[in-house]
Structure formats: C-alpha cells, structure tokens
Design a protein with these regions (language model features):
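Non-catalytic terminal/accessory segments
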Residues: 1-155
Length: 155
C-alpha cells in the first residue's frame, strides 16, 4: 500500500522541526538559508517524497564527550532530511503504533521513561528474575531489509 504524502504533512513537519531549531547538517544549510526559499524548499520536499524520488544527504558526524572520557558519535541530518523524517513519522505512526507492545515506552507518543519505570516495578510483583542487557551499537546494526518488510506488512 502506498501512503499518500500531502502538502499539509510537509508543512506540519516543517513547523515541528523548526521549533527545535537545531544546527546544520553536512550540507551546511542553516535555517536562515532554508527559510529564504522556504515555500520552494517545502514544495521540492513534497514533490520528491510523494513521487518516491527523495534521497537523503550524508549525515554530519560529531562526537560528544562522555563522562568516562570516551566519545559518543552523533549523526546530524540536514534540515531537509529532518523534515522528511518528521513527515514519515507523522504518516506512518498511526498505522504502526497499534502494533507495538503495551510494555514498550521508548519514542512513543504519550509514553515516557517514568511510565517504563512504573511498568518495571509492576513486573517485579509477578517475576522473581530480571534480564539486564545492552546491545552495543544496536541502532547502527538493525537489518534494514527486515525492518522495511515489517513496515510494508503493517502499512
């Protein structure tokens, strides 16, 4: 099923991303430059995304210092890519959200870490064991082919 991308989706995404402000990506385009041709830029985003011809730009890589002295890599997408990500989140979320587990709290609307902690406390009433694990680099190693199969299946 091909989900329609409407111009209003792009406008709403722009407004949400613009509120966060944020710095430039690898293309060095800041908000002043983007807003100078805002309507042209938003139309191009809509045109390319809705026709399947949008391709993201490279991500700017920066490193944040960690308390232990190490560094954590952070990828900063360009403004256009952040808008496209928000468009896709807004369009896909209503289809995918009902399929997530009730005990899943990360990056979900109306859910937060405090609710996750409360769920953990509730779970301790029923279980006498706990598994604590951290998959290093998990998001960098998600098999995208399987992820896309799941998205297509639920949309």
């Amino acid at each position: 099923m091909r989900l329609p991308i409407e111009k209003r989706h792009v406008w709403e995404a722009y407004q949400a991303v613009r509120l966060n402000d944020g710095t430039h990506g690898a293309d060095m385009e800041d908000w002043v430059a983007f807003d100078r041709r805002r309507y042209h830029n938003l139309f191009r985003i809509w045109n390319r995304v809705s026709s399947g011809a949008y391709f993201p730009k490279p991500v700017r890589r920066v490193f944040l210092r960690k308390d232990d002295g190490g560094e954590r890599p952070l990828g900063i997408p360009c403004i256009r890519d952040r808008i496209v990500q928000e468009v896709l989140r807004g369009v896909l979320e209503p289809y995918l959200e009902p399929h997530f587990h009730d005990s899943s709290f990360a990056y979900r609307p109306g859910r937060n870490a405090h609710q996750g902690i409360a769920q953990c406390r509730t779970n301790t009433d029923y279980y006498s064991w706990c598994i604590d694990l951290d998959i290093r680099g998990y998001f960098d190693n998600i098999p995208h082919d399987k992820l896309m199969q799941a998205v297509v299946h639920f949309c």
